[in-house]
């Protein structure tokens, strides 16, 4: 098996593991999970798909658009040669090896299995402090949108801290 095929197979394993990774609870413009899936799908030779499973085709410029760009610019896209070499030197060319992808697979699997959370367990003293045992649970409920405080309970929390 050639090294590029081994890298593709490892990237496929990583994509499968990333797809099992839970989506963010709070929707962001860019998600770690989505960016990494798209990145390693290219390495694995898999087509990019959206949330519904439809394949996303990369939009390539048409021949007329390319001709228009060339006709409008005096140099290569209006940039001088020095600037192009600077840009090319700054561009990151990702070279993946089987070992580097396997390291990422191991790191992601330890995160997903809560290995370090279980190893360094801190107990209930920190999660439920004696002064305000429901504090963290209320925060989590507020973030998840499960339980909303009424005006009265919010004022009580502000005034008395509990």
Swiss-Prot record:
This is Cytochrome B pre-mRNA-processing protein 6. It holds the Pfam family UQCC2_CBP6. InterPro entries: Cbp6. This protein is involved in processing of the 5' terminus and the intervening sequences of cytochrome b pre-mRNA. The keyword Mitochondrion applies. The modification Phosphothreonine is found at residue 97. It comes from the Eukaryota.
């Amino acid at each position: 098996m050639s090294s590029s095929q081994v890298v593709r197979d490892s990237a496929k394993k990583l994509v499968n593991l990333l797809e099992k990774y839970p989506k963010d609870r709070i929707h962001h413009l860019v998600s770690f999970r989505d960016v990494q899936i798209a990145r390693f799908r290219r390495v694995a030779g898999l087509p990019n798909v959206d949330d519904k499973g439809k394949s996303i085709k990369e939009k390539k410029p048409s021949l007329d658009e390319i001709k228009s760009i060339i006709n409008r610019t005096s140099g290569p896209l209006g940039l001088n040669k020095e600037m192009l070499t600077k840009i090319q030197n700054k561009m990151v060319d990702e070279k993946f090896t089987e070992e580097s992808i396997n390291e990422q697979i191991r790191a992601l699997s330890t995160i997903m299995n809560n290995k370090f959370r279980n190893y360094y367990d801190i107990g209930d003293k920190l999660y439920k402090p004696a002064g305000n045992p429901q504090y963290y649970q209320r925060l989590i409920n507020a973030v998840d949108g499960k339980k909303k405080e009424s005006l009265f309970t919010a004022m009580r929390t502000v005034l008395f801290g509990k």
